[in-house]
Amino acid sequence: LLNFWATWCAPCVQEVPSLVQLQSQMGSKVTVFAVSMDQDEAAYRAFTLKRMAGLLTVRDPDHKSSAMYGTFAYPESFLIDKDGKIQRKFVGPVEWTSPEMIDYFNKL
C-alpha cells in the first residue's frame, strides 16, 4: 500500500494511526510504504519517530514520486500488487482497519 501524506495535512495525520494498525494487524500480507511530501525534514523526523513506528517511510520534498502517480492532493493511497500493478486508488483519508477494509485485504 503506497500512501502519500504530509505532517501539515490534517486528514493525513488523522489517517496515520489506522495505517500503523493495518501494518501491525496484517503483518507480511500487506506492506505500508508511506511517502511524505514534507519540505521540513525536522518535522518529518519528529512525526515519524513518534507516530509511525513499524511503517516504511521516506521523505520526498520535491514531490517527484507523487507526480509520477498523478497525485497532488493528500492523503492518497495506491494498492499495488506483487507484480507492480495498481489494483485500486484511494483518495482522501481511509479507516484502514475498518471491518470492510480488513475483509478487502484478506481477500487479496
Please place each PLM-identified region on the residue numbering.
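Thiol/disulfide oxidoreductase modules built on the thioredoxin-like
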Residues: 46-54, 60-107
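Hydrophobic beta-strand anchors of alpha/beta hydrolase catalytic cores
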Residues: 1-2, 32
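A structural alpha-helix within SAM-dependent methyltransferase catalytic domains
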Residues: 20-24, 106
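Conserved SAM-binding loop
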Residues: 1, 11, 58
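Short alpha-helix adjacent to the SAM-binding motif of class I
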Residues: 14, 21, 42-50
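Conserved redox-active cysteine motifs that mediate thiol-disulfide chemistry
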Residues: 4-21
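Solvent-exposed loop/turn segments at secondary-structure junctions
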Residues: 6-10, 38-42, 63-65, 94
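Thiol-based oxidoreductase modules, predominantly thioredoxin-like and allied folds used
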Residues: 29-42, 53-63
